[in-house]
């Protein structure tokens, strides 16, 4: 796992949490939760790739892992759309920078998950 990606996730989550304090947006809270969930999933998938023997354990423990993978891509697409919408509607430069970084991170994570999943398939 790339340490820059980890710090990027942490930075964006902290920034979004600060925005949450300023506005009582339930949508933003949901986005933060989705980001945290996505980070955990990406980390677990990356660890499984590092230990290729875990592929069989992963498949036997959860026969629906491809379905889960598909669901995660749906979540990523949803988050990308939400972030794009927030970018269009916000006027705060702090929020714009945060959402631009979040969008870039989502695209990077989507690519990482695709790479991991192809290695597992």
From Swiss-Prot:
Keyword Transport tagged: yes
GO cellular component, as recorded: host cell nucleus; virion component
Cross-referenced InterPro entries: Flu_NS2
Gene Ontology biological process terms, A to Z: exit of virus from host cell nucleus through nuclear pore
Quaternary organization: Interacts with protein M1. May interact with host nucleoporin RAB/HRB and exportin XPO1/CRM1.
Remaining remarks: Average number present in a viral particle is estimated to be 130-200 molecules.
Protein's job: Mediates the nuclear export of encapsidated genomic RNAs (ribonucleoproteins, RNPs). Acts as an adapter between viral RNPs complexes and the nuclear export machinery of the cell. Possesses no intrinsic RNA-binding activity, but includes a C-terminal M1-binding domain. This domain is believed to allow recognition of RNPs bound to the protein M1.
Family: Belongs to the influenza viruses NEP family.
UniProt name for this protein: Nuclear export protein
UniProt lineage: Viruses, Riboviria, Orthornavirae, Negarnaviricota, Polyploviricotina
Gene: NS
């Amino acid at each position: 796992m790339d340490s820059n990606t980890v710090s990027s996730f942490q930075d964006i989550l902290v920034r979004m949490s600060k925005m949450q304090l300023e506005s009582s947006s339930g949508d933003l809270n949901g986005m933060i939760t989705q980001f945290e969930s996505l980070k955990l999933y990406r980390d677990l998938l990356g660890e499984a790739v590092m230990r290729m023997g875990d592929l069989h354990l992963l498949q036997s423990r959860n026969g629906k892992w491809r379905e889960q993978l598909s669901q995660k891509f749906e979540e990523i697409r949803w988050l990308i759309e939400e972030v794009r919408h927030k970018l269009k509607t916000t006027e705060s430069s702090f929020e714009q920078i945060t959402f631009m970084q979040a969008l870039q991170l989502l695209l990077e994570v989507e690519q990482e998950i695709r790479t991991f999943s192809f290695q597992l398939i």
